[in-house]
């Protein structure tokens, strides 16, 4: 069976939460850094309900001094299970 990589959004959100805590950043700090008018996007990232765009992942990685691969969690998904 072929396995395709997929992003585990919940685990990625946990990484974002961990990095924010590690660097002493609040949701409001991240919201302000991105210039968002409200914090909902950041809360959704943390809960794994949505993913930052590629551009925003690059910014997050730069803010935290890590690689994008240190933020996103990629897992293999069995292709057969996707089309069954």
Predicted regions and their residues:
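DNA major-groove recognition helix of helix-turn-helix
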Residues: 45-46, 56, 75
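A short, Lys/Arg-rich alpha-helix, primarily the initiator
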Residues: 1-25, 33
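Short alpha-helical DNA-recognition segment
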Residues: 24-44
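DNA major-groove recognition helix of helix-turn-helix/homeodomain DNA-binding modules
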Residues: 55-70
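Residues within the helices of the helix-turn-helix
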Residues: 17, 28, 58
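Short amphipathic recognition helices of helix-turn-helix/homeodomain-type DNA-binding modules
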Residues: 70-84
